[in-house]
């Protein structure tokens, strides 16, 4: 089955449930909200003047987002084709610069762009955990739930799995079960 076929079936089932219960689907899904929390997000780092070329640039950009009213920030650090990326040490420096810029209680998250091995992902995770980051997203180029489970067992920070899980709905079911 394709994702499209599954989506059509899922929508039909939600519609059927709503009709059987005489409740609109939007209520079955939890109603609506007057406000939705949003967080600021950085682009991936680069090597261009005026971009996100240094940890200080990340700190300055974080201050800029705070001044515009964002209540949380998710960072995306450097990745190829940046000549020296990926680098655990540089990522930790950027994360530390942002933490210093926004203060100890400001919610921060890191999306590591799936560039790290298990060992490097653990080192980076410990670094941002010590900086009080809220979550750690997609640190490994890994689609195994076991690798992510191992990482989660070795850190005290929530781990977000990969955005792209190959294998369609069968793989997603494995992630949900984990």
Place the predicted regions along the sequence by residue.
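N-terminal capping/lid subdomain adjacent to the active-site entrance of alpha/beta enzymes
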Residues: 1-109, 113-115, 119-122, 126-130, ...
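Catalytic alpha/beta core domains of metabolic enzymes, predominantly
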Residues: 143-148, 152-178
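Structural recognition of alpha->loop->beta junctions
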Residues: 124-136, 177-178
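Catalytic beta/alpha-barrel core
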Residues: 74-76, 109, 113, 132-143, ...
């Amino acid at each position: 089955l394709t994702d499209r076929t599954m989506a059509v079936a899922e929508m039909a089932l939600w519609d059927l449930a709503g009709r059987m219960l005489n409740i609109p689907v939007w209520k079955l899904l939890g109603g609506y909200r007057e406000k939705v929390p949003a967080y600021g997000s950085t682009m991936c780092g680069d090597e261009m003047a005026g971009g996100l070329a240094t940890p200080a640039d990340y700190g300055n950009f974080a201050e800029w987002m705070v001044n515009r009213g964002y209540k949380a920030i998710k960072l995306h650090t450097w990745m190829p084709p940046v000549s020296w990326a990926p680098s655990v040490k540089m990522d930790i420096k950027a994360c530390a610069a942002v933490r210093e810029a926004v203060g100890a209680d400001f919610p921060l998250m890191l999306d590591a762009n799936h560039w790290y091995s298990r060992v490097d992902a653990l080192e980076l995770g410990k670094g941002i955990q010590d900086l009080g980051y809220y979550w750690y997203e997609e640190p490994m180029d890994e689609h195994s739930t076991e690798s992510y489970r191992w990482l989660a067992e070795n850190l005290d920070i929530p781990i977000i799995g990969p955005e792209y899980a190959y294998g369609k709905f069968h793989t997603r079911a494995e992630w949900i079960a984990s």
